C-alpha cells in the first residue's frame, strides 16, 4: 500500500499532499503549505528543502511526484520556480525516493478530466475524490492533485499488466 507525496512547487508557497493507496482507493493522509518569509532566495530554498525533508520523515512516503516547470512569460519567475523544484527534488532523493514529474495538463486531466480545468475545479474534485469535509487551500489541492495523478498513472500501469513503476524523467537517484 504505497504512500505518495505530491508537491506543487513555488518559491514563496510550496504545497504538499500525502495520500495512501489501498487497492483502487486513495486515502487522504495530510496536506498543507510550506510558506517562506525571507526575500533572500537561498534562505527560501533552505526552508523548502527542510520542510519537504520533515514531511518525508513524518509520513514515510514510498513515492514522490512533483509538478513539472511550465514556460513562464517572466524568465526570472521560471528560474526561481525551477530552483524551488530542485530543493524539493533533492530532499526526495536524499530520502532515496523515486521521483516522477507531471505537467499541469496531465495533473488536471487526471483529477478533473480536462487539462484546461480551473484551480477551483481542481480543489472541488480533490475534495470529492478524497472525501474531505472542505476544499483544501489552492496550493495544497494542487499538490494532492499531483499525488492523485501519480496514483492514476500507477494504477494504469498495473491494469495494463506492466510493472508497478512509473516512467520518471531522470530517476534522480
UniProtKB/Swiss-Prot annotation:
State the organism named in the record: Shewanella loihica (strain ATCC BAA-1088 / PV-4)
Q: Which domain of life is it from?
A: Bacteria
This entry's comment on the bound cofactor is: Binds 2 Mg(2+) ion per subunit.
- Which GO biological-process labels does this protein carry? DNA recombination; DNA repair
Q: How does it assemble?
A: Homodimer which binds Holliday junction (HJ) DNA. The HJ becomes 2-fold symmetrical on binding to RuvC with unstacked arms; it has a different conformation from HJ DNA in complex with RuvA. In the full resolvosome a probable DNA-RuvA(4)-RuvB(12)-RuvC(2) complex forms which resolves the HJ.
Give the annotated active site.
8, 67, 139
Q: Which Gene3D superfamilies match?
A: Ribonuclease H-like superfamily/Ribonuclease H
Which positions bind Mg(2+) 1?
8, 139
Q: What is this protein called?
A: Crossover junction endodeoxyribonuclease RuvC
HAMAP family, alphabetized:
RuvC
- Family classification: Belongs to the RuvC family.
**Documented EC number(s):** 3.1.21.10
Keywords recorded for this protein, A-Z? Cytoplasm, DNA damage, DNA recombination, DNA repair, DNA-binding, Endonuclease, Hydrolase, Magnesium, Metal-binding, Nuclease
Which positions in this protein are listed as binding Mg(2+) 2?
A: 67
The compartments listed are:
Cytoplasm
Molecular function as annotated in GO: crossover junction DNA endonuclease activity; DNA binding; magnesium ion binding
Per its database record, what is this protein's job?
The RuvA-RuvB-RuvC complex processes Holliday junction (HJ) DNA during genetic recombination and DNA repair. Endonuclease that resolves HJ intermediates. Cleaves cruciform DNA by making single-stranded nicks across the HJ at symmetrical positions within the homologous arms, yielding a 5'-phosphate and a 3'-hydroxyl group; requires a central core of homology in the junction. The consensus cleavage sequence is 5'-(A/T)TT(C/G)-3'. Cleavage occurs on the 3'-side of the TT dinucleotide at the point of strand exchange.
Top EC group? hydrolase
Amino acid at each position: 500500500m504505497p504512500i505518495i507525496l505530491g508537491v506543487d512547487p513555488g518559491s514563496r508557497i510550496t504545497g504538499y499532499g500525502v495520500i495512501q493507496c489501498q487497492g483502487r482507493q486513495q486515502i487522504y493522509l495530510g496536506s498543507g503549505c510550506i510558506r517562506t518569509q525571507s526575500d533572500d532566495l537561498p534562505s527560501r530554498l533552505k526552508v523548502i528543502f527542510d520542510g519537504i525533508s520533515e514531511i518525508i520523515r513524518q509520513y514515510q512516503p514510498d513515492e514522490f511526484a512533483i509538478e513539472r516547470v511550465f514556460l513562464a512569460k517572466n524568465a526570472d519567475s521560471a528560474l526561481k520556480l525551477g530552483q524551488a523544484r530542485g530543493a524539493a527534488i533533492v530532499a526526495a532523493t536524499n530520502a532515496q525516493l523515486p521521483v516522477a514529474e507531471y505537467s499541469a495538463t496531465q495533473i488536471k486531466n487526471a483529477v478533473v478530466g480536462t487539462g484546461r480545468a480551473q484551480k477551483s475545479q481542481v480543489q472541488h474534485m480533490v475534495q470529492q475524490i478524497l472525501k474531505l469535509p472542505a476544499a483544501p487551500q489552492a496550493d495544497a489541492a494542487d499538490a494532492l492533485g499531483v499525488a492523485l495523478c501519480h496514483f492514476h498513472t500507477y494504477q494504469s500501469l498495473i491494469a495494463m499488466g506492466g510493472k508497478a513503476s512509473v516512467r520518471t524523467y531522470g530517476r534522480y537517484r
